[in-house]
Amino acid sequence: EHPLSAMSPYGQNKIDIEQAIFSDPFFKTDCCTTVLRYFNPVGAFQDGLIGEIPRGIPNNLMPYLLGVVNKVYPFLQVFGHDYKTVDGTPVRDYIHIMDLIDAHYQALNENKTGIEVFNVGTGEGYSVMQIIKAFEQVNKIKIPFKYMPRREGDVETCFADNKKILKRLNWKSKRDIYQICFDAFKFSQKN
């Protein structure tokens, strides 16, 4: 329904995989195929036992932020502060991994032959600085950061048009950005 374009090899790979599915007659007629387009999955299981532990230097905001909290890195690098956003930093749609799991369950219960594509996100965007402030507020921790030049390939704003999944699968995210920040921090402290 929306034109797809990639800003990176990773993004192009995702598009190529979708195109391979769409071009195979088996997926169109003989089975129920659901493509879930994730936006920015973050957070951790609420018991703090399962979460993300990146290898090497993370490229995503939350793992890098947690690396700063855990003294792996001296400060958080904020790439770009001159975007046309609420505070000049990039905006993304962050979805709690537990909400993502719920979306998978809803999709598995969809029993329709053919291919369905759903955007899985909250439909709301938060800037890098809004995430930092939410993390600081909910966890009572100050995050040292420095503004850096923009990264090549980063887009200004990206969030899900999630109307289709809301309507068709009756799915909606339940956890807000504060819960995401709390659960991610809890996991990082246990691991």
Please name every model-derived segment:
Residues 61-191:
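C-terminal substrate-binding subdomain of Rossmann-fold SDR/epimerase-dehydratase oxidoreductases
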Residues 1-3, 9, 41-44, 81, ...:
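Active-site pre-Tyr helix/loop in NAD(P)-dependent dehydrogenases
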